[in-house]
Amino acid sequence: VKDVTDFLQSYAVESKQVSVEIINPSKENIAKKLSEIGIRGYPIRTSSADSASITNVYSAIKIDYLGKSETIPFVLNISRLEFDLTRKIKSLIEEKENPVQVVCASSFANGYSLAFQYLEAEGFSVIQTSLPSEKNSSVDISFDELSDIPLIIFGSDKFTKTDCKILEKFILNGGKVFIASQPYSIDFEDNWSVKQNESNQLFERLMFTFGIYFKQTLTCDISNLRITMTSNSDVNGNKKSAHTEYINYPLWISLRAQENALSGLSLFWPCAFDIDNEVAEIERLKTTTLLFTSNRSWQIPRTENFITNPFAVPKSAESEEEYSTFAVCASTTKENEKDPSLILFADQYAFSDSLLSYNSNSIFDVDSRSLDFLCNGIFMLNGEDELLSLKTKTTFNTTLYKISNENIRNAAIKTLFTTCVLPIFINLTIGFVFFLKRRRFNK
């Protein structure tokens, strides 16, 4: 892949300590050797007007340093290559892994396998730990035993009063935590009803310490996802033959592109919150918004129960005054410190296997924007801002090599005109004008 080859050569020019060797597996006949070190070919379908074929493509990068190595197993473009290279080289030089511990405090604790896989693919070494109240044996590891390792918590359905006290102490004493949870849970496998147990309430009160106050509402937005529903009744409840309907569901929010989510991302039954920094300052903390809804967002208050039925949930606010922008993710930073100690993401379902699968085109095309934000959050907690800036860097121009055979003649003519004909014409024009002025001056 020419883009990748050119980028690697440019990357090596920046330092005398970096060298690049390009190897063509078909010419070197080393496909078997590559397979032994974890590099395999990927079948790529190519087609033209006359034929179609499948080619086994090798496009991997192996980085060697003092007898150790790291591998990027497959790369076809340079959209994030600088980030991947820098991360791998940094890991080799510093001789350390990037550990992160994960606690599943959700009611569906086994529903986050995709998040685990994504974290590992991004170079993190995942350690599954438990809440202190759930430690059953000496084999189990409680999250507070690994105070130097950043912590991810999914859900809040299992918190005890003791867990909340230990977590608060963990954060205030220097621990780094990314929490993804609403102050309630959704019965996603059945009727989508909203439940709030004592554990959710304890978690909600814990957030008061950081100046975060959950609204007793569900958050809706005009910018939302369209879902597919099957129904055997009409809008009045009368029976009719089974049919499929596509419904805009305001409780599944599509966050628009913003500073901390350049491609936007999806939220499922999120609970917005207010921030009170006068309360946070008691512990010498400051909380700031990271993600927010659109300005056409509104809240559904709890009556007897929250309305979550896609056919019954209001599609808009009752009045214009109810529309506003609401915080759905925030970070809390200690006084005189640059890096946050806590990131609260007000939705545990955006990282779950069920909703990631539902919101994706196929198992090979998962909507990973929320998982990407999760990884970014760990970089923020670790103070790796420079690495994060490389990850979100998007100003690559590779259009020179993105020309089809059918358009190559026209592209060549345009290139020749721009680089040869146009400069000659400009120089001749300048010379002619200068000649006329000189001639008039001599007269």
Regions found by a protein language model. Name each.
Residues F74, I78, F108, W192-Q196, ...:
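Generic alpha-helical structural element
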Residues M380-I408:
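Juxtamembrane amphipathic/hinge helix adjacent to a transmembrane helix
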Residues E94, N110-E386:
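Acidic, S/T/G-rich, low-cysteine, solvent-exposed domains in lumenal/extracellular/periplasmic regions
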Residues K16, E97-V100, K215, W298, ...:
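Residue-level signal for secondary-structure boundary elements
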Residues V1-C164, Q182:
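Juxtamembrane extramembrane loops of integral membrane proteins
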Residues T399-K443:
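C-terminal signal-anchor/stop-transfer transmembrane helix together with its immediate cytosolic
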Residues L34, T46, N232-D234, L400-N407:
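Alpha-helix boundary/capping detector
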